[in-house]
From Swiss-Prot:
It is an enzyme of class 2 (transferase). CDD domains: Lumazine_synthase-I (cd09209). Keywords: Riboflavin biosynthesis, Transferase. It comes from Tropheryma whipplei (strain Twist). Catalyzes the formation of 6,7-dimethyl-8-ribityllumazine by condensation of 5-amino-6-(D-ribitylamino)uracil with 3,4-dihydroxy-2-butanone 4-phosphate. This is the penultimate step in the biosynthesis of riboflavin. Pathway: Cofactor biosynthesis; riboflavin biosynthesis; riboflavin from 2-hydroxy-3-oxobutyl phosphate and 5-amino-6-(D-ribitylamino)uracil: step 1/2. Belongs to the DMRL synthase family. It holds the Pfam family DMRL_synthase. GO terms for molecular function: 6,7-dimethyl-8-ribityllumazine synthase activity. The keyword Iron does not apply. This is 6,7-dimethyl-8-ribityllumazine synthase. InterPro entries: LS (IPR034964), LS/RS (IPR002180), LS/RS_sf (IPR036467). The lineage of its organism: Bacteria, Bacillati, Actinomycetota, Actinomycetes, Micrococcales.
Length: 156
């Protein structure tokens, strides 16, 4: 019987046993806004990808909206992508519209190309929330990378 493909995203020790040595190529696409937070997401995602035996290549885009087009173009030559960014609440509801646009766009790309995209786009109220979710025990970049690796493996 095949390997168990329903492992929890919260079990880092299991990723190597599920994936092993692979040739998975993953584009890590990160927005440039809120660099300190995004850097934590990048570090977590790339560390997770490399530790699985997969290949990570980093691409930077101006902001979270640009993640959508970058995912679409890069998925022509990559097996999967991890999209990383930060959308910080301001004094208006602009962040809500941007978040919807980005998440809807990424989902549309994923479904159209039938390739997985791990979403590590944080929608936060404060910078501290972003720092908390991009480091330590809960790093959204790590979780996005784990999810995308498992999805690639599921469909191989």
């Amino acid at each position: 019987m095949g390997k168990d493909r329903n492992l929890s995203l919260n079990s880092p020790e299991s990723i190597q046993s599920v994936i092993g040595d692979t040739d998975i190529k993953i584009a890590v696409i990160a927005a440039m806004w809120h660099e300190k937070i995004v850097r934590g997401l990048i570090d977590g995602a790339t560390r997770e990808i490399v530790s699985s035996g997969s290949h990570a290549e980093l691409f930077r885009v101006p902001g979270s909206v640009e993640l959508v087009l970058a995912c679409k173009k890069l998925l022509k030559t990559f097996d999967a992508a991890v999209a990383l960014g930060v959308i910080l609440r301001g004094e208006t509801d602009h962040n809500t519209h941007i978040a919807r646009l980005v998440l809807s766009g990424i989902t549309d790309v994923m479904l159209a190309l039938e390739k997985p995209i791990g979403i590590g786009v944080l929608t936060i109220d404060t910078e501290q929330q972003g720092l908390d979710r991009s480091s330590g025990d809960y790093n959204a970049g790590v979780n996005a990378a784990r999810a995308v690796i498992r999805m690639v493996r599921l469909f191989r």
